[in-house]
Amino acid sequence: MAQKIYIPDTLANWKWPPHLNPHYPEVKRESAAWLASFGAFSPKAQDAFDRCDFNLLASFAYPLAKKEHLRSGCDLMNLFFVIDEYSDVAEADEVQRQADIVMDALRNPHKPRPKGEWVGGEVTRQFWELAIKTASPQSQKRFIATFDTYTQSVVQQAADRTHSYIRDIKSYFEVRRNTIGAKPSFALLELEMDLPDKVIEHPIIQDLSILTIDMLHLGNDIASYNLEQARGDDSHNIVTIAMNQLKTDVAGAMKWVDNHHKELERKFNESFEKLPKWGEPIDSQVARYVDGLGNWVRANDQWSFVSERYFGKKGPEIMKSRWVTLLPKERTEDIGPQVVDDSLL
């Protein structure tokens, strides 16, 4: 009899309900066509990639964004997963080369990319060339700084994978806070804002940011674990790490995640009530920014079940029952998402 996995409902009491940006259908068409134009994946993998619908993730994550800012969000989500899919099957030195290309493209968005270069360079350049047309200077500065940190963490993840290195919980959290790509995503919450460094760097804002990131990566890991273990790429997943460190099984690891998530939620709500005041117009911008953090947690969870990324067409059903069947090992070296049991690796 096939083994069943229970996925805890970590957001049962989360006070942010899901909201979808009304520009989603139009912007999805634009961003999806833009990404497909690069031919980054085989036709089969491109079809699977389209079914993941990362534009839906952006539209849940930025429900109040103007059309042009939602386009930046959609393009970014698609860029993230181009980077992920190529780096997931590459050695650390190749991933470092990809990271260097991405950062050069971000810092020089108007400079043509070299002929024959890895496709991620031009995807990055075009994304950023369009985004900066409507992005505030502060959001641009923070985006580039946080994206640099993100790309280097992806290199570290590749090195860990190459050496079959399974981290302990503490060091995993430190690395995962960057590999999930949340910090650059938060910079897009600021596209219309002009928040000074002293505000973003305030301890309470920083605490809220880290707590949000930790809830995001825990939610992502419990949703993606089944596919990642089937792919043989689960060493960078909290379920595997908790099983290894706590000497427990999948059910025990999921229970640990659920309990830890509840503690993160409690701390987030406490810090949310302690937001400092700077006066207007900063206070209104901070309120929107922090509300955006809370919404991101819900957006990630909603997309995980509504899209076909992790559960195929069974997502809404699994969102209610919380039970999934453990998938068999299906190791693949192909670039791009693969279909396994109607879900997408």
Curated annotation (Swiss-Prot):
Positions that bind Mg(2+) 1: D84
Positions that bind (2E,6E)-farnesyl diphosphate: R309, Y310
An individual GO BP term: isoprenoid biosynthetic process
PROSITE patterns in UniProt: MYB_LIKE
Amino-acid positions noted as binding Mg(2+) 3 in the UniProt annotation, renumbered to this chain: N220, S224, E228
Domain comment, as recorded: The DDXXD motif is important for the catalytic activity, presumably through binding to Mg(2+).
Name of the molecule in the record: Delta(6)-protoilludene synthase HETIRDRAFT_454193
Taxonomic source organism: Heterobasidion irregulare (strain TC 32-1)
